[in-house]
Structure formats: C-alpha cells, structure tokens
Amino acid sequence: DICTNCCAGTKGCNTTSANGAFICEGQSDPKKPKACPLNCDPHIAYA
C-alpha cells in the first residue's frame, strides 16, 4: 500500500482508489512543496 494524501500528492498526478475511481489531483508542486500532513488517506490505492 502507498501512504499519501491529496495535499502531499504531486501536482498533475491523480490519485485513484483500488477500483480505479478518481479521488483527487495532487496539490504539491515538486519545485515548491507544500507543508502537508503525513497522514495516509485510506481510500488512495494508486498515485
């Protein structure tokens, strides 16, 4: 399992659940990372 959340995901990269449902797009710019909580969103299976 991966451990990520919408905030920590990379901008432009979508996260999906185990059945392929779209959850969110990442919000963190690799050049200017956001300060994100390190919690795992249990719904996110792929990023």
Curated annotation (Swiss-Prot):
Pfam families: Prot_inhib_II. The record marks 38-39 as: Reactive bond for chymotrypsin. InterPro entries: Prot_inh_I20, Protease_inhibitor_I20. The keyword Repeat applies. It comes from the Eukaryota. Gene3D superfamilies: 3.30.60.30. Inhibitor of serine proteases chymotrypsin, papain and trypsin. Has strong antifungal activity against C.albicans and R.solani. Has antibacterial activity against the Gram-positive bacterium C.michiganense, but lacks antibacterial activity against the Gram-positive bacterium S.aureus. Lacks hemolytic activity against human erythrocytes. This is Potamin-1.
